[in-house]
Amino acid sequence: MFTGLVRTMGRLQRWRSGVWVRGDLEALGPLALGDSIAVDGVCLTVSRLVGDGFQADVSEETLARTTLAPKADGGGWVNLEPALRLSDRLGGHLVSGHVDGQGEILGIQRQPASWRLEVGCNPQQQGRYLCEKASIALDGISLTLAGCDNDGSRFWIAVIPQTWITTTLQYRQVGDLLNLEIDLFAKYTERLLYAHGQAGRPQSSGPKPGPEGGSSPSQPISAAWLRTQGW
């Protein structure tokens, strides 16, 4: 588990069946085999320690769902964060390191006190969970939505200078893809509502619930339904 507060950055390159993260990684603390590290928001396990970094195996599923492959091929910069300790401060939000999909940068605008980052995403797979002031992880960075379209196809973030200059956002351009992880609570809430027949089936590639896994949904979540439930 992680917080979305990036500790440092490193360079990514291919290594056998995985990736090699290189750079000045002292900010991550002492590393050991088996440690979990968030690499651009992707939870990877240290499988080998080298002089200037570490190596990690990466499954085909992870390569297909995330942006690690093109970044490794191009030696790109990645955000790095060590796993959360129970004694640590939770300064961002709970991030699992399990990427839900990718979003495309549609616009970057410099503003007096921040950068406005506009991102497009799949409204059915990720956008359905978005709302103003919700938490989201972009390339492993804990951020807050400043707003989003009603259909969930586009959202925007106000990025403060400290976050901009200490993460890979400073290198990103319009058209680049970002790893997206939706807030855990949003996904679990939908799953629980579906189990009680109060929401449409969650977008998942896993097995459908059986007879004991919940009844068929009576209606999708809507503003009218939420009002009837006391929200």
For the regions a protein language model found, what residue spans apply to each?
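Conserved loop->alpha-helix
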Residues: 1-231
